[in-house]
């Protein structure tokens, strides 16, 4: 994405926050200091996003910190990885939940729930945010908004799984959409409702990469990607101008996008 386009997107997001419907739903503790995954490593976005959701959540969810070992963010993150991340995955054969490549959304949910059970707190659910057969992009948008708002309203800022895709052409093969890199962020602010005709909604999120609070937009892609036979997109765009997800791995001339793929929350 060019520098000029990034500036234009940031100006657009500023206008959306300033002029849109004044009803917003916020994380209960949205001003809390973000946790930086790099305290442990570049593959620790999952544990860091989990901690950011606990920290920016209501007092009930913040209680999860009391059962973690350690006295600072680095030690607590290392405790999560060691105590619940290294347990055997129920979803990936012969692998721990967390490894050098990071963690998948199902395993991250299981890790979070192990911590929550230890703290005698309710458990979380995972939702895949791809369009179901027969649904329209507008229905996917409405369902995504509903789930995110429900979790925020329950005091738990949802964890979003976002992925960078590239339309990649390999030798002797047709070009196909390929996952380049995945990442986890914590959603902390969104509009209470979608207006008629809306194709997306503005969000504020905590990015664990260097522990930043950022603005973005989630919505129906203007140009279809990972489309079905009717040319309709399978998922929603995550227009996150500040995100660095997989940018360095894009080949010259490749078409690329960041999409919302799943979420973990209280619904």
Give the label of every model feature segment.
Residues 17-110, 114, 266-267:
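Active-site-adjacent structural segments surrounding the nucleophilic cysteine of cysteine proteases
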Residues 40-45, 157, 182-184, 200-202:
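Extracellular structured ligand-interaction cores
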Residues 80-88, 112, 140-152, 256-267:
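Generic hydrophobic, helix-prone segments enriched in Leu/Val/Ile
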Residues 12-15:
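Repetitive helical segments and hydrophobic/amphipathic motifs
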Residues 145-146, 163-267:
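Active-site signature of cysteine proteases
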Residues 92-191:
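Predominantly the structural core of cysteine protease catalytic domains
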Residues 2-10:
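Sec-dependent signal peptide recognition
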């Amino acid at each position: 994405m060019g520098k000029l386009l990034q500036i234009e997107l940031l100006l657009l997001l500023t206008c959306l926050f300033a002029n849109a419907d004044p009803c917003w739903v916020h994380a209960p503790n949205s001003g809390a200091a973000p946790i930086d995954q790099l305290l442990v490593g570049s593959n620790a976005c999952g544990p860091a996003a989990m901690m950011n959701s606990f920290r920016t959540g209501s007092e009930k969810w913040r209680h999860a910190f009391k059962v973690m070992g350690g006295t600072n963010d680095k030690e607590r993150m290392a405790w999560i990885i060691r105590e619940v991340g290294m347990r055997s995955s129920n979803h990936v054969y012969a692998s721990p939940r967390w490894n050098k490549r990071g963690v998948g959304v199902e395993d991250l949910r299981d890790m979070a729930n192990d911590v929550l059970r230890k703290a005698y707190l309710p458990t979380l659910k995972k939702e895949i945010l791809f369009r179901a057969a027969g649904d329209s992009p507008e229905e996917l948008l409405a369902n995504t908004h509903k789930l995110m708002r429900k979790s925020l309203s329950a005091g738990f800022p949802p964890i979003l799984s976002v992925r960078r895709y590239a339309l990649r052409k390999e030798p002797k093969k047709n070009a196909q959409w390929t996952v380049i890199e995945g990442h986890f962020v914590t959603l902390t602010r969104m509009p209470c409702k979608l207006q008629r005709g809306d194709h997306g909604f503005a969000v504020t999120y905590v990015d664990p990469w260097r522990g930043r609070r950022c603005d973005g937009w989630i919505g129906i892609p203007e140009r279809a990607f990972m489309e079905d036979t009717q040319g309709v997109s399978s998922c929603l765009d995550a227009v996150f101008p500040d995100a660095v997800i997989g940018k360095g791995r894009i080949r010259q001339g490749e078409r690329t996008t960041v999409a919302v793929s799943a979420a973990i929350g209280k619904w």
